[in-house]
Amino acid sequence: WTKGLEKAGYATGGSYASNLQKIIEVNGLDKYDRMVMENMQSQGKEFGVHNAQGETQTKDDVKYSFPVNREEFMLVTSPFGMRQDPLDATKQQMHKGIDIQTKHEAVLATEDNGKVIAVNQNANTPGGKSVTVEYQREDNSKIQVSYLHLDAVDVKVGDTVEAGQKLGMSGNTGTRTTGEHLHFGVKMIAADGTERDMDPAAYLSDIAIKGNINLQALHNGNNLLAKYQEAEKTEGQAID
């Protein structure tokens, strides 16, 4: 997990992870981690690093993934909702997605059986190079997941994609960006055709629960998924 902190951008030096690990070991602070892992192993369970990295097999043989590969958490630089326009401080705008910190890396499909319904290869548009993947639900509703400001796109319209499959590379393309990041947007389309933008944190919370993915989406130290996960737990307890 120390390397997770370093990769996420919290480290201030190249030897951050190794130095922190030495401090933990010298003071015997790793004994609690060992106790937890030994207890899990005695129960036939595996430590959850592979789950945290996104591709997770579930009972119904459907996989789920986060849009980027992380060991413990991903950093969100701008959440869903009203915000100051990053290109004009005098204006407010509705941010219809979340901005995820990236470093020229693969962006991934979040579910199995997704259909690529849109690809934009024009870097000089507001969202730059982008991909939209649609997932059909049993009630005939649909979820559309979009990835903006990409450096490269690896799929084409009509492709079927699976969870964890690389769709392209993150980047800084587009006329409405101030630095590299992944703008991750989610739209829900009801069976009657009604559309609405939803908080991607709510969608990722659902993905995390279904796929048993132990990752956080941190913005200013707060896990954006927590309120949605707590709501689902409360709802489940009420049904029970």
Q: What function would you assign to each model-found segment?
A:
Residues 1-56:
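Catalytic cores of secreted/periplasmic lytic hydrolases that degrade extracellular macromolecules
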Residues 8-13, 24-31, 80, 120, ...:
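Sec/Tat-exported extracytoplasmic proteins
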Residues 10-18, 102-105, 141, 176:
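Soluble non-cytosolic domains of exported or imported proteins
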Residues 43-129, 163, 176, 224:
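Surface-exposed, glycine-biased beta-strand/turn segments
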Residues 55-64, 159, 185-239:
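Acidic, glycine-rich catalytic/binding loops that coordinate metals and/or anionic ligands
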Residues 78, 102, 118, 149-152, ...:
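A residue-level detector for short acidic-glycine micro-motifs
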Residues 93-96, 110-157, 179-185:
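Zn2+-dependent peptidoglycan hydrolase active-site motif and core
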Residues 114, 158-173:
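Active-site-proximal beta-strands of protease catalytic cores
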